[in-house]
A protein has these predicted regions:
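Conserved SGNH/GDSL esterase-like catalytic core that processes O-acyl groups on lipids
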Residues: 79-223
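C-terminal region of N-terminal signal peptides and the immediate post-cleavage residues
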Residues: 31-54, 67, 131
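Catalytic nucleophile-elbow at a beta strand-turn-alpha helix junction centered on a G-D-S/GDSL motif
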Residues: 54-71, 76-77, 82-86, 90, ...
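Histidine-centered active-site loop/cap adjacent to the catalytic His
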Residues: 341-398
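Mobile gating loops/cap/lid regions near enzyme active sites that modulate substrate access
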Residues: 259-363
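Serine-dependent acyl-ester chemistry module
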Residues: 189-223, 246, 259-297
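N-terminal export and membrane-targeting signals
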Residues: 5-27, 361
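Structural recognition of the beta-strand scaffold that forms the well-ordered cores
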Residues: 55-67, 132-136, 175-180, 185-187, ...
Length: 409
């Protein structure tokens, strides 16, 4: 008599299969727990374009970081609150003496002079997102935006801006990246400062003009600057791709600049005398003001527009975004005893060595930055393309700004 055989799986094999199934379930639970822990731990989660929290981000230099955001126009009074224009003035006494706390405006970036203001364009733009992230830093050049592995350099003790963008892009759903850089690569600010010095050490009978040598310097440096700005855009795209973004998931916008000065026909102080320096903070000869407001800024903007087109990025022309509110423009005025008003005030910080820091000079002030933020919001509401913002003199920011398609080549 023989023993009966079991045609199904042996007891041992069934136990082995059960153990494998239990182990797999345990591993799945462990993986889920780790993912949940990462999601709850700040700085670790990798959500990227799938994040429930949306964001817009700015990279670049002082024009977009918020340098000059301390000021609401330019005051006629040299002390105290400076006619109500100095947002850093605190604890003012009955005699009008005040303490000054610029960190109220620039936060932690006051310490390293990146000067990211609380009204920087990316922060003041009325765009419905969860986070408005300002990574721009005063004084940055294009190389400070490149990722470190592309040769990017730290600036003011901070990593390259593209590497900072990587952390934001992993954590948030970045809808727009605004890049404003290139002016420092051609030394535009230093050249304009030289124009002011030329004005101060010469007279109307024999003026020392800057626009000839300044234009030659910009023409020499522009080819290299174009290459470096283009590399910055490549770095942004590569950073976003590494974070899981497709090109259609976000908007990449390269913006130009606005001159701090209007054309000479709008200047409210004469060339002779010292009023352009002591009253207005706009010490330029007429011919140099015309260059700064015209060919000087035009050549930089044209170069940046070509870079944007070559990179497949959008372009935002800001040459007219401060019209009627530039330094010493007779369509605006200094702030008097009535206090600041955005409709009539200048939107650019005057050249000053006695109030705040000289680094703030010739940058959009708090009003100018809010105006640029309004411009950015208008662009964001339009389809992808090339756009230009234009301000209407004598009107408040919400009424003054309009955006239009940028024509020409």
């Amino acid at each position: 008599m023989t023993a009966a055989t079991d045609s199904g799986p042996s007891r041992a094999s069934r136990l082995r299969a059960l153990a494998v199934a239990c182990l797999a379930a345990l591993l799945l639970l462990l993986a889920a727990a780790l993912l949940l822990a990462a999601a709850l731990r700040p700085g670790v989660a990798w959500a990227g374009p799938d994040s429930p929290r949306s964001a817009i981000v700015s990279l670049g230099d002082s024009f977009i970081s918020g340098e000059g955001g301390r000021w609401l126009g330019n005051g006629s009074e040299p002390f105290g609150t400076r006619s109500g224009t100095d947002r850093a003035a605190v604890a003012c006494d009955d005699l009008g003496f005040c303490d000054y706390e610029p960190e109220r405006i620039y936060g932690a970036s006051e310490a390293n002079e990146c000067h990211r203001s609380d009204v920087a364009p990316i922060r003041s733009a009325p765009i419905a997102v969860d986070a408005q992230v300002n990574l721009a830093c005063s004084g940055a050049r294009a190389r400070n935006l490149w990722p470190a592995d592309l040769g990017g350099r730290p600036h003011f003790g901070e990593p390259p801006e593209a590497d900072q963008l990587a952390e934001v892009a992993h954590r948030l759903d970045v809808r727009l990246v605004l890049v404003t850089v290139g002016a420092n690569d051609v030394g535009f600010g230093s050249l304009v400062a030289g124009c002011a010095l030329d004005w101060a050490r010469s007279d109307r009978a024999a003026p020392e003009l800057c626009h000839g040598y300044a234009e030659a310097e910009i023409d020499t440096l522009l080819p290299r600057a174009r290459h470096r700005v283009a590399r910055a855009l490549v770095g942004v795209e590569r950073t976003m791709r590494a974070a899981g973004y497709r090109r259609r998931d976000y908007r990449l916008v390269l913006s130009g600049y606005a001159s701090p000065f209007p054309a000479s026909r709008w200047l409210r102080y004469p060339e002779s005398g010292w009023d352009r320096l002591t009253e207005g903070g706009c010490p330029l000869w007429d011919a140099d003001a015309d260059w700064a407001a015209g060919p000087g800024i035009d050549s930089i903007v044209a170069a940046l527009r070509r870079v944007a087109a070559g990179a497949g990025a959008e372009f935002l022309d800001l040459r007219h975004a401060l019209d009627g509110h530039q330094l010493c423009d007779r369509r605006s005025h200094l702030v008097g005893t009535a206090g600041p008003s955005e409709a009539g005030a200048e939107w650019v910080r005057r050249l000053s060595f006695t109030q705040g820091t000289s680094r703030e000079s010739l940058h959009p002030n708090a009003y100018g930055q809010r105006a640029l933020g309004r411009c950015l919001a208008l662009l964001y509401a339009r389809p992808r393309g090339e756009w230009s913002c234009r301000a209407e003199p004598g009107r408040a920011i919400g009424e003054a700004m309009r955006v239009e398609a940028l024509g020409g080549g």
